[in-house]
Regions:
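Short, solvent-exposed helix-loop connector elements
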Residues: 52-56, 81-88
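Active-site beta-strand/loop signature of hydrolases that rely on acidic residues for catalysis
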Residues: 1-4, 39, 72, 94-95, ...
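Short helix-loop capping/hinge motifs at secondary-structure junctions, enriched
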Residues: 77-80, 107-108
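Residues at the C-termini of beta-strands that transition into short coil/loop
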Residues: 40-43, 76, 88
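Surface polyanion/phosphate-binding segment centered on an Asp-His-Pro turn
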Residues: 85-109
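Short basic/hydrophobic patches in alpha-helices and adjacent helix-turn junctions
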Residues: 70-77
Length: 109
């Protein structure tokens, strides 16, 4: 998970794989220095938008999850992002598909 908004219990997970400081720094570098864009967050900045839930306890039912599945795009695709969602109508595994729609007519040249 990249930011605290991307997992339910970020404070207690700061030293767990998937939210370690060096992992978050790597994502920061991809986005802030290299210039890649988190396509999901272009349109959805709401909390509790997760793509993975533990199979333990009631994580799915209580939406205690992490957003660890990403669409990273180059900056010229930012304006083309037209819809984003996490498909949760069916449960296929501990991950849910992250769906991004792109409007090719809105892509920057």
């Amino acid at each position: 998970a990249h930011k605290a908004i991307d997992l339910k219990n970020w404070r207690s997970n700061q030293m767990n794989s998937g939210f370690l400081p060096h992992e978050r720094a790597w994502m920061d570098a991809l986005i802030d220095q290299v210039g890649w864009v988190d396509a999901f967050r272009v349109l959805n900045r709401q909390p509790e938008q997760y793509s993975w839930w533990s199979n333990r306890g009631q994580a799915w039912a209580k939406n205690v999850g992490w957003r660890i599945d990403y669409h990273l795009v180059t900056p010229d695709w930012r304006e083309a992002v037209s819809a984003v969602s996490v498909y949760k109508d069916q449960r296929f595994s501990d991950h849910a598909p992250v769906v991004i729609d792109y409007d090719l007519n809105r892509r920057a040249p």
